[in-house]
Amino acid sequence: MADIYPLGKTHTEELNEIIVESAKEIAEPDTTMIQKLIDEHNPEPLLKGVRYYMCENDIEKKRRTYYDAAGQQLVDDTKTNNRTSHAWHKLFVDQKTQYLVGEPVTFTSDNKTLLEYVNELADDDFDDILNETVKNMSNKGIEYWHPFVDEEGEFDYVIFPAEEMIVVYKDNTRRDILFALRYYSYKGIMGEETQKAELYTDTHVYYYEKIDGVYQMDYSYGENNPRPHMTKGGQAIGWGRVPIIPFKNNEEMVSDLKFYKDLIDNYDSITSSTMDSFSDFQQIVYVLKNYDGENPKEFTANLRYHSVIKVSGDGGVDTLRAEIPVDSAAKELERIQDELYKSAQAVDNSPETIGGGATGPALENLYALLDLKANMAERKIRAGLRLFFWFFAEYLRNTGKGDFNPDKELTMTFTRTRIQNDSEIVQSLVQGVTGGIMSKETAVARNPFVQDPEEELARIEEEMNQYAEMQGNLLDDEGGDDDLEEDDPNAGAAESGGAGQVS
């Protein structure tokens, strides 16, 4: 088969090979190559979405200029320079995040032991971290989790910011990670700043500190550098795969901002320029007729400081005031706003848009674009969570708590947070169950009024048992009445009382 990459290895691939070869077993990796990887890494594209989320748009770079007599363009610091950033990107990201994971992800399983472990792990902190992850991956295109076993031997996890990560995959499918490098700045208690780096392989973690411009093994870890993923009975154990979990925003790993940044910039520009015009055109332009008195500078000074002017003979003064194209600007902003919602695949849930048509078909149409975006993101989140629970299951197996297969035994349910007609949803779920096309478990998991499906199912079962018991008592009572008609009334009363006590 012909080589589909005839140009050979890239420089980065060559660096990767050197690092991997030097990191076999517990040999110390080549820190020179690590430094080169860090030098070649550019996190700026990841941070552009973060800037716009924080309303630090490119409009802040706006400058007003003029041309001098020589035709040279210069910055005019005397003119009004409005630089208004609009939080469109934040609106779209927050809407997507709350739509996807505003309601906690619910888990169900026939394996009650596994479900108990999972629900204990998926607490309020889990929900909060997942919300932050969806927000971050929408801003940056990708975000990472790091699962680990803490010093007390407990399973834990933390977000690794994507801008700190250099992740190298085994091949172009980008499924299996070869190794991951994290680098960041650390401030000590005295404010001193230190450069740190961590190299993650499928067996160990190597810790580095930059000293005199060179990354060296971080000796603050003592003999525990490199450190295994976990230990059992004094024996080092590795996960068998690199403990870095990518949460991709999409397959291209790009920010949502990419698809509508130009529209936001245009919106900011028109708004800021219009505000500049309001400030500039408050000044009146004076037309001097037959004016032969003072020079223009003297005229302006007299007018500004003394509110008087001098004219000669038939001279006079007229004024001009420029008209601001407010209507044209407003129409263009309205057009851009409409394009923004389409390009961002977002929902304009203003009263003017929704009106009084909050019924099933109208809401489905309103959320159609957001559903497209959310479906793609949900697939990527599921992939990240499946890998996360694989690590958790490995931890449970290594600690003797059970051998589980979350891929087959665990079901995740995402509840979309939207304006909805709850009565219509519940009615539809009831019809699905009674019609035999939906299980009771699925219906309960999708019920908008249910927070914990397992707890709700337990309550339903308890109520059904109580109802069955009541029905049994009623049947017993009816049987006692029949006996009363045939037997002695006193004996019947005694039997009825006895049955009541037994029940």
Swiss-Prot record:
One of its GO terms (cellular component) is viral procapsid. It is found in: Virion. Residues 463-503 are annotated as: Disordered. Residues 475-489 have a biased composition (Acidic residues). Changing N365K: In siz A; 6% reduction in DNA packaging. One of its GO terms (biological process) is symbiont genome ejection through host cell envelope, long flexible tail mechanism. The keyword Transmembrane does not apply. Keywords: Capsid protein, Viral capsid assembly, Viral genome ejection through host cell envelope, Viral genome packaging, Viral long flexible tail ejection system, Viral penetration into host cytoplasm, Viral release from host cell, Virion, Virus entry into host cell. It holds the Pfam family SPP1_portal. The keyword Transferase does not apply. Coiled coil: none annotated. Changing E251K: In siz S; 4% reduction in DNA packaging. Homododecamer. Has been seen as 13-mer and 14-mer multimer in experiments, but assembles as homododecamer in vivo. Interacts with the gp7 protein. Interacts with the connector proteins gp15; this interaction occurs at the end of the packaging when the terminase complex is replaced by the connector. Forms the portal vertex of the capsid. This portal plays critical roles in head assembly, genome packaging, neck/tail attachment, and genome ejection. The portal protein multimerizes as a single ring-shaped homododecamer arranged around a central channel. Binds to the terminase subunits to form the packaging machine. Necessary to ensure correct procapsid size during capsid assembly. Once the capsid is packaged with the DNA, the terminase complex is substituted by the connector proteins gp15. Belongs to the SPP1-like portal protein family. This is Portal protein. It comes from Bacillus phage SPP1 (Bacteriophage SPP1).
